[in-house]
Amino acid sequence: GKDLSKRIVAIAGMKLNEENPLVRAFAESFTRVVIYPTRSLTKAEAKAQSEEEKIEEEKRARTINLAAMRAMDKCKRDGEVILVFPSGTRYRPGHPETKRGLREIDSYLRMFDVMILVTINGSCLTIDMNNPDDMLADLIEPAVQVFASSPVIDCKEFRKEYLATLPASEADPKQKVIDHIMEIFDEQHEKIERLR
């Protein structure tokens, strides 16, 4: 329990470090590895004013993510536990893309030995739909929360077995693997929700 809690290292998108000083202060209170998610890169590229800006942003993302992979590898060797929210964001009702798992998760499956899928049913924070991108605008309310976990899953076996079910012509097997993980999360969440 307590020993494990001291060894948790969260994966945090760079938005938590850059967008708001107060959010950054909270994020810095946790041990974390910062990544540049592909979803953020896609948004940044769409906002880029020139091809040079796009190239610079891609280079920045590669640099951050390479450093993150090295840091995660060190965490693994040091016996630390990596905490990842596989969609990389909070679920927003009416925005199904916020429930889609990030393709990068496949790299983590190849890197780590085991995983446990943890679901949280219920939330004491509600997204303020007038300010959905501002975490500080979230509304706080009482809630019953139920945390549940899957059995321990061997990452490499899980990935290998699932990839074997895909046709050879599958265009994006990495995304399919994380889509399958998200399906398992949904099943686990629905099962607990019926009990809550």
Set out the residue ranges of the language-model regions.
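Non-catalytic C-terminal accessory region of glycerolipid acyltransferases
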Residues: Q49-R196
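Catalytic core of membrane glycerolipid acyltransferases/transacylases, capturing the structured
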Residues: G1-E57
